[in-house]
From Swiss-Prot:
Protein name: Hypotensin-like peptide
Function: May potentiate the hypotensive effect of bradykinin.
One GO biological process term: regulation of blood pressure
GO cellular component: extracellular region
UniProt keyword Lipoprotein, yes or no: no
Tissue: Expressed by the venom gland.
Originating species: Tityus serrulatus (Brazilian scorpion)
Keywords: Hypotensive agent, Secreted, Signal
Subcellular location: Secreted
């Protein structure tokens, strides 16, 4: 019985640690996004700024092995 209580207690502690680590990671990511948004673009051409914003809006590229093996004959 005591062993079961100890296991439950340790499990709860691990869960709390995991959730707090996730929250801290999300907070750091939010800060990074805010810092990127605060970039000063004065003196840069509008076309370059437009391309930067379009690139940042795209989802990250993923490697798809199915398309890699296809031949374009």
């Amino acid at each position: 019985m005591k062993m079961m209580i100890a296991i439950v207690f340790v499990s709860i502690l691990l869960l709390m640690f995991s959730l707090s680590s996730t929250a801290m990671g999300m907070e750091t990511e939010q800060q990074n996004m805010e810092e990127r948004a605060d970039v000063d673009f004065t003196g840069i051409a509008d076309s370059i700024i437009k391309k930067i914003k379009e690139t940042n809006a795209k989802p990250p590229a993923r490697f798809d092995p199915a398309t890699f093996g296809e031949n374009e004959d």
